From Swiss-Prot:
UniProt-listed Pfam families: GatC
GO molecular function terms attached to this record: asparaginyl-tRNA synthase (glutamine-hydrolyzing) activity; ATP binding; glutaminyl-tRNA synthase (glutamine-hydrolyzing) activity
GO biological process, one term: translation
Source species taxonomy: Bacteria, Bacillati, Bacillota, Bacilli, Lactobacillales
Stated family: Belongs to the GatC family.
EC number: 6.3.5.-
Description of how the protein assembles with itself and partners: Heterotrimer of A, B and C subunits.
Substrates-to-products reaction catalysed: L-glutamyl-tRNA(Gln) + L-glutamine + ATP + H2O = L-glutaminyl-tRNA(Gln) + L-glutamate + ADP + phosphate + H(+); L-aspartyl-tRNA(Asn) + L-glutamine + ATP + H2O = L-asparaginyl-tRNA(Asn) + L-glutamate + ADP + phosphate + 2 H(+)
Functional description taken from the UniProt entry: Allows the formation of correctly charged Asn-tRNA(Asn) or Gln-tRNA(Gln) through the transamidation of misacylated Asp-tRNA(Asn) or Glu-tRNA(Gln) in organisms which lack either or both of asparaginyl-tRNA or glutaminyl-tRNA synthetases. The reaction takes place in the presence of glutamine and ATP through an activated phospho-Asp-tRNA(Asn) or phospho-Glu-tRNA(Gln).
Entry superkingdom: Bacteria
Protein name: Aspartyl/glutamyl-tRNA(Asn/Gln) amidotransferase subunit C
Organism: Leuconostoc citreum (strain KM20)
Top EC category: ligase
Length: 102
C-alpha cells in the first residue's frame, strides 16, 4: 500500500475554496488528519469486492411516502407581502458569497 500525502498548501487551498481560515498550527493538524483519512481510503480500495453484489441499500425497505407532485399554490402575493424584501415577484435575500473570480 502506498501512502498518500497531502501538502499544507493543498489543505490551505481547499480551506480557501470552502471560505474557511486556519492558523498555521490548525493547517498542520488538518494536513495530518486529511492524510490519515486518504490512507484509510487507500486501505478500503485494496479490499477484494469482486464477489460482492453491488447494492444501493442494505435493507429491502420500500418507500412508503406519497408521490412528489407539484401543486399550484395560488398564494404567491400573500407570501411576497410578508417577505422582508421582494423584487420582481421574487423574495430577495442577502448575498452570502463574494465574487472572487474562482
Amino acid at each position: 500500500m502506498s501512502e498518500t500525502t497531502i501538502s499544507k498548501e493543498e489543505v490551505a487551498h481547499v480551506a480557501k475554496l470552502a471560505k474557511l481560515s486556519f492558523d498555521d498550527s490548525e493547517l498542520t493538524q488538518f494536513t495530518t488528519q486529511l492524510g490519515d483519512i486518504l490512507n484509510i481510503f487507500n486501505t478500503l480500495g485494496e479490499v477484494d469486492t469482486a464477489a460482492v453484489e453491488p447494492t444501493y441499500s442494505v435493507t429491502e425497505n420500500v418507500n412508503h411516502l406519497r408521490d412528489d407532485v407539484a401543486h399550484n399554490w395560488h398564494q404567491k402575493q400573500g407570501l411576497l407581502e410578508n417577505a422582508p424584501l421582494a423584487s420582481a415577484g421574487l423574495i430577495k435575500v442577502p448575498a452570502i458569497l463574494e465574487d472572487e473570480g474562482e
